[in-house]
Amino acid sequence: AGKISRIDVFTNTVNYSADFATTEHPDFLNIEGDSLYFFLDGGVFVGNALDYLVPTAAQLTVPFFYNMNIINGKLYGCNAGDFASNGTVEVYDLSTNALEATLNVGIIPGNVYLNE
């Protein structure tokens, strides 16, 4: 079973914990600004990072992601496809939840980085 916990870094204690069902495993935790994002069973869930409570409904339904990154209000979902052929990176605008682009990339794309 998966779990998301919030730890008070000053006291090193868990001050909030959310348990998931035995077969649920949240992945790809991202924080941007005051928002916390994670992927679970084809959905992207969003909550407030400061007073976080696990949301009950996905903000966005997406295909399988091998990984995802949130950068400047965009979700970059790495789709490894069949893990033997080239994959894609899907770019979503989080203000509209619209798919903006699908980029063809190499085999098993794993991350997207911002180079400033």
Please name every model-derived segment.
Residues N12-A21, Y52-L60, A98-L103:
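A short beta-strand motif characteristic of beta-propeller blades
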Residues A1, G43-F45, G81-S85:
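Short glycine/acidic-enriched loop and turn motifs that connect beta-strands
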Residues T88-E90, S95-E116:
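Blade-level signature of beta-propeller repeat domains, shared across WD40, Kelch, NHL, RCC1
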Residues I4-I7, F45-L50, V89-Y92:
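Hydrophobic/aromatic beta-strand positions that recur at structurally equivalent sites within the blades
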Residues T22-G33, V62-N72, V105-E116:
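Repeated scaffold domains used in trafficking and secretory/extracellular systems
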Residues L29-Y52:
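C-terminal structural cap/anchor segments
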Residues A1-L36:
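Acidic, serine/threonine- and glycine-rich low-complexity intrinsically disordered segments
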Residues S35-F38, K74-C78:
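Conserved beta-propeller blade signature
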